[in-house]
Amino acid sequence: MTKEIKADAKTRMDKAIDVLSRELAKLRAGRANPALLDRVTVEYYGAQTPLNQLASVTVPEARLLLITPYDKTAVASIEKAILKSDLGLTPSNDGQVIRIAIPPLTEERRKDLVRLVSKTAEESKVAVRNIRRDANDELKKLQKDGEMTEDELRSATDDIQKLTDTYVAKIDEKAKQKEQEIIEV
């Protein structure tokens, strides 16, 4: 039973790391990254459609995104959606494709992004700690029900704590990498 609790905690912590990775990928670090446009939805034939379903997004250069719509009639709608998004990007349209030049970040924007990275990392740490608390509660319930001894409980909670420490260290590492990426000019 304790193995199942540990495995469940590990799976949930892996998911927390995945969420953090996706959130950090969305932050603009002065480099072009197709994930920047993941949240953009386009008005297409009366329905809000994710951009990645209407076009391919590629990175031909470090500071350039190239959006190639599958349907050329959607070019204007895609451009409008990008302008309306809160990304602060300005698309240029040649009728076939849309190019987005990623401007270099200002010092103030870099500081804001570093704060946002720290906040996002802290939220992930809280999620991991909540998972630890849930696992420990389940273990204590097993011990209370007489399914495990006090020593087994202590050993299992120590294992959960080690797992938590490992995942918190992974979160710190990912946050540090993203901060370095943002700070580099």
Swiss-Prot record:
Is Cytoplasm included in the keywords of this UniProt record? yes
Q: Name one GO molecular function term.
A: ribosomal large subunit binding
This entry carries the following GO cellular component terms, namely: cytoplasm
**Is the keyword Nuclease assigned to this protein?**
no
Q: Which UniProt keywords apply?
A: Cytoplasm, Protein biosynthesis
Query: What Pfam families would the database entry show?
Result: RRF
Instruction: Enumerate the InterPro entries for this protein.
Output: Ribosome_recyc_fac (IPR002661), Ribosome_recyc_fac_dom (IPR023584), RRF_sf (IPR036191)
Subcellular location(s): the record lists: Cytoplasm
Query: Biological process GO terms, please?
Result: translational termination
Tell me the function of this protein.
Answer: Responsible for the release of ribosomes from messenger RNA at the termination of protein biosynthesis. May increase the efficiency of translation by recycling ribosomes from one round of translation to another.
Note the PANTHER family from the entry.
Answer: MITOCHONDRIAL RIBOSOME RECYCLING FACTOR PSEUDO 1, RIBOSOME RECYCLING FACTOR
Spell out the family assignment given in the record's similarity comment.
Answer: Belongs to the RRF family.
Q: What is this protein called?
A: Ribosome-recycling factor
State the organism named in the record.
Shouchella clausii (strain KSM-K16)
